[in-house]
Amino acid sequence: MARYLGPTCKLSRREGTDLFLKSGVRPLESKCKAETAPGQHGQRRGRLSDYGVQLREKQKVRRTYGLLEKQFRSYYKEAARLKGATGENLLKLLESRLDNVVYRMGFGATRAESRQLVSHKAILVNGKALNIPSYQVSEGDVIAVREKSKNQLRIQNALGIAAQRPDVEWVDVNADKKEGTFKRVPDRVDLPADINENLIVELYSK
């Protein structure tokens, strides 16, 4: 499936915030200039229209989870069919993706690296190898690194990076065994406050 393979810092600069597309816990400002748009002579951002604000929020979330527009819109349509607030449903669907859960558990330093681990069958779900990054993880599912992949240096490094991030309340991880349990779908209060999912709903509702 097609993926963006260009500079990840460029995407974060475009959205004006760290999308955590690079490994490590350094703030974006130490890696690239968040206040300027991409390009050698990036210009300061002007005032956006309502549509522009909505579009930038959608792009920010879509790029954070590493999805193409068609995929992201499909998640929105599914979220709209579910009971409850569409915006919250959207975030819960995104957070329940297998590649994202692998990232949240700290087995991958980034979502892109976590997706690669899944694609290469380095991840087990309830004891079975699964190579579908979009697989929706359910409560109680056990996610583990495959035995022959446990000594990969990138996984060791990722766990070290994850230890410096705030705890993820909806997963339970045993770093020594390199396995974890998806305890529950996260509530809205568990997720970043700087995401305004209502802007995405407004954009797609037009």
Swiss-Prot record:
PROSITE patterns: RIBOSOMAL_S4 (PS00632), S4 (PS50889)
Matching InterPro entries: Ribosomal_uS4, Ribosomal_uS4_bac-type, Ribosomal_uS4_CS, Ribosomal_uS4_N, S4_RNA-bd, S4_RNA-bd_sf
Species this chain originates from: Teredinibacter turnerae (strain ATCC 39867 / T7901)
One Gene Ontology molecular-function label: structural constituent of ribosome
S4 RNA-binding domain residues: 96-156
Cited function: One of the primary rRNA binding proteins, it binds directly to 16S rRNA where it nucleates assembly of the body of the 30S subunit. With S5 and S12 plays an important role in translational accuracy.
Pfam families with a match to the protein in the record: Ribosomal_S4 (PF00163), S4 (PF01479)
Family named by the database record: Belongs to the universal ribosomal protein uS4 family.
PANTHER family linked: 30S 40S RIBOSOMAL PROTEIN (PTHR11831), SMALL RIBOSOMAL SUBUNIT PROTEIN US4M (PTHR11831:SF4)
Name of the protein described by the UniProt record: Small ribosomal subunit protein uS4
Gene: rpsD
GO biological-process terms attached to the record: ribosomal small subunit biogenesis; translation
One GO CC term, this protein: small ribosomal subunit
The entry's keywords: Ribonucleoprotein, Ribosomal protein, RNA-binding, rRNA-binding
